[in-house]
Amino acid sequence: MDAIKKKMQMLKLDKENALDRAEQAEADKKAAEDRSKQLEDELVSLQKKLKATEDELDKYSEALKDAQEKLELAEKKATDAEADVASLNRRIQLVEEELDRAQERLATALQKLEEAEKAADESERGMKVIESRAQKDEEKMEIQEIQLKEAKHIAEDADRKYEEVARKLVIIESDLERAEERAELSEGKCAELEEELKTVTNNLKSLEAQAEKYSQKEDKYEEEIKVLSDKLKEAETRAEFAERSVTKLEKSIDDLEDELYAQKLKYKAISEELDHALNDMTSI
């Protein structure tokens, strides 16, 4: 009997243990079902989150593509602007070289004009000397005319003084011959002076024509210098505009680079979050 009671107790105990295990199994089953439901909900949520992340990734990829295209366009514009600036620098250099050559030609023309003015001054001084000589010759001729008048007066007085005629006549004739020789000599010198005066006059006319020619050239050089100065100002204005354009492009490039860097950081954060989500799903 004791053995049966003992066995009955053991069976009862086993039954109670079995009931406890059944209840525990039921509880574990319910907990597993709840955990499964929770995991399914989390999976659906993660799938939705993954879908949203993929959509956002597509959006950021498109934005990144647009940013890259804008960056390439900005780089192309910057390259074109640099080429324009280089071209302007070459044009400015050519204009400066042409201006230097024009200044050299102007300096040469001014030097020649100064030499021509000096030659004209020397010719003018020569003219004054010639005029002074001619005036002296005229004074001599006037004196000779006076002497000739005196000789004629003496000849008229010879009729009244016959005794003195022979002696004075010889003297008068001799004086008259000398006076005529001096008069002929003066006439020859006057002819030479007139010829020299014509030569000097022609030289002065030639110098005046040459001076006028240099004046015209000087006006032409001044006009060329003015045109070159205007071109230089225009080139400087265009160069300043190109520099401002390059500055704006550089700022745009910097802004795009900052935006691209921010997008990269955002993309990196999203990628890390997506990796964590995938790892969580894998571990589940």
Curated annotation (Swiss-Prot):
Phosphotyrosine is found on Y261
Going by the UniProt record, its keywords in alphabetical order are: Acetylation, Actin-binding, Coiled coil, Cytoplasm, Cytoskeleton, Muscle protein, Phosphoprotein
Q: What modifications follow translation?
A: Phosphorylated at Ser-283 by DAPK1 in response to oxidative stress and this phosphorylation enhances stress fiber formation in endothelial cells.
Places the protein is found: Cytoplasm, Cytoskeleton
Q: Which residues are recorded with the post-translational modification Phosphoserine?
A: S45, S174, S186, S206, S252, S271, S283
Q: Which GO terms describe its biological process?
A: actin filament organization; cardiac muscle contraction
Q: Where is this region: Disordered?
A: 1-38, 116-136
Coiled-coil spans are 1-284
Keyword Phosphoprotein recorded: yes
Which GO molecular function terms does the record list? actin filament binding; disordered domain specific binding; identical protein binding; protein heterodimerization activity; protein homodimerization activity
Among PROSITE patterns, the record links this protein to: TROPOMYOSIN (PS00326)
Q: Where is the composition biased (Basic and acidic residues)?
A: 12-38
List residues modified as N-acetylmethionine: M1
What GO cellular-component annotations does this UniProt entry give? actin cytoskeleton; actin filament; cardiac myofibril; myofibril; sarcomere
| Oligomer status and interactors | Homodimer. Heterodimer of an alpha (TPM1, TPM3 or TPM4) and a beta (TPM2) chain. Interacts with HRG (via the HRR domain); the interaction contributes to the antiangiogenic properties of the histidine/proline-rich region (HRR) of HRG. Interacts (via N-terminus) with LMOD2 (via N-terminus) and TMOD1 (via N-terminus).
Tell me the PANTHER family matching this sequence. TROPOMYOSIN (PTHR19269)
Q: What is known of its domains?
A: The molecule is in a coiled coil structure that is formed by 2 polypeptide chains. The sequence exhibits a prominent seven-residues periodicity.
Q: State the similarity comment.
A: Belongs to the tropomyosin family.
Q: What does this protein do?
A: Binds to actin filaments in muscle and non-muscle cells. Plays a central role, in association with the troponin complex, in the calcium dependent regulation of vertebrate striated muscle contraction. Smooth muscle contraction is regulated by interaction with caldesmon. In non-muscle cells is implicated in stabilizing cytoskeleton actin filaments.
The protein's name in its UniProt record: Tropomyosin alpha-1 chain
The opening ranks of the lineage are: Eukaryota, Metazoa, Chordata, Craniata, Vertebrata
